[in-house]
From Swiss-Prot:
A Gene Ontology BP annotation from the UniProt entry: DNA catabolic process
CDD domains given in the database record: ExoVII_LU_OBF
Purpose: Bidirectionally degrades single-stranded DNA into large acid-insoluble oligonucleotides, which are then degraded further into small acid-soluble oligonucleotides.
Gene Ontology CC annotations of this record: cytoplasm; exodeoxyribonuclease VII complex
EC numbers for this chain: 3.1.11.6
Localization (cell): Cytoplasm
Keywords of the record: Cytoplasm, Exonuclease, Hydrolase, Nuclease
Gene name of the record: xseA
Name of the protein in its database record: Exodeoxyribonuclease 7 large subunit
Similarity section: Belongs to the XseA family.
A Gene Ontology molecular function term of the record: nucleic acid binding
Pfam families: Exonuc_VII_L, tRNA_anti_2
Organism: Shewanella frigidimarina (strain NCIMB 400)
Domain of life, per lineage: Bacteria
Length: 450
């Protein structure tokens, strides 16, 4: 295979060859990693695959989690959520983007514990604590069982109930201890040591009921693992529910999925051989787990080599490309729909503006406005006219003869001619005098021009 440093003018990479070569380098040299960060740009198209961006305060990386993997995730990721993910570095060749192909995803709190759990499991496996050849056989004729658990917990009640039903002759010695909290692991170790010092039981049943990963964390202690491994008494681990797995399950001689199952495993049911089969199955499970753990590293290495020639990578590339095109198409359709909706609204508004009803309404409003202006103008006009008439009347009254009469003057006339000068009269003429109130008819008896 060519290396990137070998390219010359006569040996030039194509873009596709470059992206393929970079993918092989990243997948071969880095492989799978754990990564902690915040989810953003999460999308879950109809194909069932998940696409997201994992970021911190300074950087981000794209991630893809295909349907076969994300079905095991116990929560629905949301933007802004802190998570711990495990994935393999790869390159999405069509775009030349490097990305993580995710295998698992946990909430940040559980994720850190799970990462610590995996690290401790690998360490103890390397030390040989899980080796099948170190497992102690469980006695076939058990007379007395030592139960290490809480004296007030439901697990002890379940165990006593099962033993009373299946084999009441079995005695139970309880080594009470805390099974949750910061000091629980140390107290459980002390209970195992005490039981080994007394040697009064045939087998130890280490147990408690179900709970969260934090609740069961005391059973993932390295000190507890060594205490179980160093015990002279056989130890059966029956912690939590069937889906829960602890370090004590790997180190113990036999693992039972529940406290009740542990009691059934260690008791006989009127000659029923089912418990023997269950014991063998449990031992087989332990052996398989150990074998799987031993082969994990080799399988991982072979997996990386196989991926270079496996069509699954191409299929994932095609699926991711399909999802990318589908999301782009959906976004384009949504954009087109938004534009059509906006255009429809604009046309609707224009139609409303030109509607006869709206036009009539606007004309009515305009007519009302004109009528109001006409009324106001009419009022102003008549008011001004009234003022002018009043002023004219005043002016007329000022020059009116009647106004003169009202000030004590009179008008004298003869034969309908106003007498302005005494020379116009002679003795014996009949004259008419107009007063403010009424008139007087007189006969001239004397005329004076002075």
């Amino acid at each position: 295979m060519r290396t990137l440093m070998s390219a010359t003018k006569n040996n030039v990479y194509s873009v596709s060859q470059l992206n393929s070569e970079v993918r092989h380098i990243l997948e071969g040299q880095i492989g799978k990693i754990w990564l902690n960060g915040e989810i953003s740009n999460f999308s879950a198209p109809s194909s069932g695959h998940w696409y997201l961006t994992l970021k911190d305060a300074h950087s981000q990386v794209r991630c893809a989690m295909f349907k076969g993997r994300n079905q095991s995730v116990r929560f629905k990721p949301v933007n802004g959520q802190q998570v711990l993910i495990k994935g393999a570095i790869s390159v999405y060749e069509p775009r030349g983007d490097y990305q993580l192909l995710l295998e698992s995803m946990l909430p940040a709190g559980d994720g850190l514990l799970a990462q610590e759990f995996e690290a401790l499991k690998l360490k103890l496996a390397a030390e040989g604590l899980f080796a099948l050849e170190t497992k102690r056989p469980i006695p076939t004729n058990i007379q007395r069982i030592g139960v290490i658990t809480s004296a007030t917990g439901a697990a002890l009640r379940d165990i006593l109930h099962v033993l009373a039903r299946r084999d009441p002759s079995i005695e139970v010695v309880v080594y009470p201890t805390q099974v949750q909290g910061a000091t629980a692991s140390q107290l459980i170790c002390q209970a195992i040591v005490t039981a080994n010092q007394r040697m009064e039981v045939d087998v130890l049943l280490l147990t408690r009921g179900g709970g969260s990963l934090e609740d069961l964390w005391c059973f993932n202690s390295e000190h507890l693992a060594h205490a179980i491994y160093n015990s002279a008494l056989p130890v059966v681990s029956a912690v939590g529910h069937e889906i829960d797995t602890t370090i004590s399950d790997y180190v113990a001689d036999v693992r039972a999925p529940t406290p009740s199952a542990g009691a059934e495993l260690l008791s006989k049911d009127k000659g029923n051989k089912a418990e023997k089969l269950a014991l063998l199955l449990s031992r087989l499970q332990q052996g398989m787990k150990h074998y799987q753990l031993q082969q994990y590293g080799r399988l991982t290495q072979l997996s990386h080599q196989l991926q270079r020639h496996e069509p699954q990578h191409k299929l994932q590339q095609f699926e991711q490309r399909f999802d990318e095109i589908q999301m782009r198409l959906e976004n384009a359709l949504q954009h087109k729909l938004s534009r059509l909706t906006l255009r429809h609204q604009q046309l609707h508004n224009r139609l409303q503006q030109r509607s006869p009803v709206n036009t009539l309404t606007l004309e009515k409003q305009r007519l009302g406005y004109l009528i109001e202006r006409f009324n106001d103008a009419s009022k102003d006009y008549f008011k001004q006219a009234e003022s002018r008439v009043s002023q004219a009347a005043h002016n007329l009254d000022t020059v009116s003869p009647l106004a003169t009469l009202s000030r004590g003057y009179s008008i004298t006339s003869t034969n309908e001619h106003v007498i302005e000068n005494a020379n116009q009269l002679s003795n014996g003429d009949v004259i008419h005098t107009r007063l403010k109130q009424g008139s007087v008819t007189s006969t001239v008896t004397d005329v004076s021009t002075k």
